[in-house]
Regions:
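Conserved ABC ATPase signature
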Residues: 7-11, 15
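Conserved catalytic motifs of ABC-family nucleotide-binding domains
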Residues: 28
């Protein structure tokens, strides 16, 4: 609603991204295909958009599914039921976030070293990238 009367070319990148996601949801398809739906958003809005998508597909009465292309490893770890890890156009690994997001897969796919931190009480994991950026 907050963007309804504003011209699209007057919106910021993040606002445009949220409008595009809202338009896709308004179409009410059975299958959503999102290509980087959080790319221009700050962290709070990334989580808000992904929670909205998660709510759409987790409702047992809706029978909706979503395929989300995303480069943020931690957002994928938090929201994905299944992950396809692609490297140079080929599927390198497929499965749950815990199965796919291993230090070896991330090192090969993203060419960075990392540490996987898994919560002991549940299946939550976090990827801590260790590589430093040289200035």
């Amino acid at each position: 609603e907050e963007f309804a009367f504003r011209r699209f070319d007057r919106l910021s990148g993040g606002e445009r991204q949220r409008v595009v996601v809202a338009k896709a949801i308004a179409q009410n398809p059975d299958l959503f295909l999102f290509d980087e739906p959080t790319s221009d958003l700050d962290l709070r809005n990334q989580i808000e958009v992904m929670k909205t998508i998660e709510e759409l597909v987790s409702d047992p009465n809706s029978r909706k599914s979503a395929i989300v292309s995303i480069h943020d490893i931690n957002i994928a770890a938090r929201f994905a039921d299944r992950i396809l890890l692609l490297h140079e156009g080929e599927i390198k690994s497929e499965g749950t976030p815990i199965d796919v997001l291993t230090e070896e897969n991330i090192a090969e796919g993203f060419e960075v070293s990392c540490e996987i931190i898994q919560s002991s009480g549940d299946s939550t994991l976090r990827v801590l990238v260790k590589d430093e950026i040289k200035l």
